[in-house]
């Protein structure tokens, strides 16, 4: 193997790991913001607790799904 091939393989692995890490951090921040908004909404309007909670869970699931795809792509970049 030439030095260039080794460097390119290492760079691809590092890029995949960094991308997966940023995806996980972004999902954590996004879900935190969703939870913050839900708690503020429930504090303002306690009678709408069930509706707010259902929407919060749906939004958090969508964020987690997008983050999961990003993490898988990052891991594939490391492997391939």
Where is each model-derived feature located?
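Hydrophobic, small-residue-rich transmembrane alpha-helices and their short perimembrane loops
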Residues: 1-80
């Amino acid at each position: 193997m030439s030095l260039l091939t080794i460097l390119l393989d290492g760079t691809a692995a590092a890029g995949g790991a960094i991308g997966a890490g940023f995806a996980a951090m972004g999902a954590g921040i996004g879900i935190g913001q969703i939870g913050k908004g839900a708690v503020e909404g429930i504090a303002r309007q306690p009678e709408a607790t069930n509706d707010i909670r259902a929407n919060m869970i749906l939004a958090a699931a969508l964020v987690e799904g997008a983050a999961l795809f990003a993490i898988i792509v990052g891991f594939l970049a490391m492997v391939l």
